[in-house]
Design a protein with these regions (language model features):
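Ubiquitin-like/PB1-type beta-grasp interaction modules and other compact soluble beta-rich domains
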Residues: 1-78
Length: 79
């Protein structure tokens, strides 16, 4: 199964990319994906970030489905 990963802000700068496709053998939770990405990109371990799937912030037990768009979002402030 394939998903599209999008990186923003300091995450995109740290990884030197804004987007990529990732193949996964099966459906994974957000927590599983986070673990996998932190093995591929150890720099992510030192960055506080949230994960959104299909433009909605999700919890760590959310199951990611085929063709999902997954965004890694650094801390942000608004008002």
């Amino acid at each position: 199964m394939k998903i599209t990963l999008k990186y923003f802000g300091m995450i995109a700068e740290s990884l030197a990319k804004q987007e990529e496709e990732l193949s996964m053998e099966k459906s994974q939770t957000v927590s599983d994906l986070r673990d996998q990405l932190e093995k591929i990109y150890p720099k992510l371990k030192s960055i506080d970030y949230r994960i959104a799937v299909n433009q909605s912030l999700v919890e760590s037990n959310y199951s990611i489905q085929q063709d999902s768009e997954v965004a890694l979002l650094p801390p942000f402030a608004g008002g």
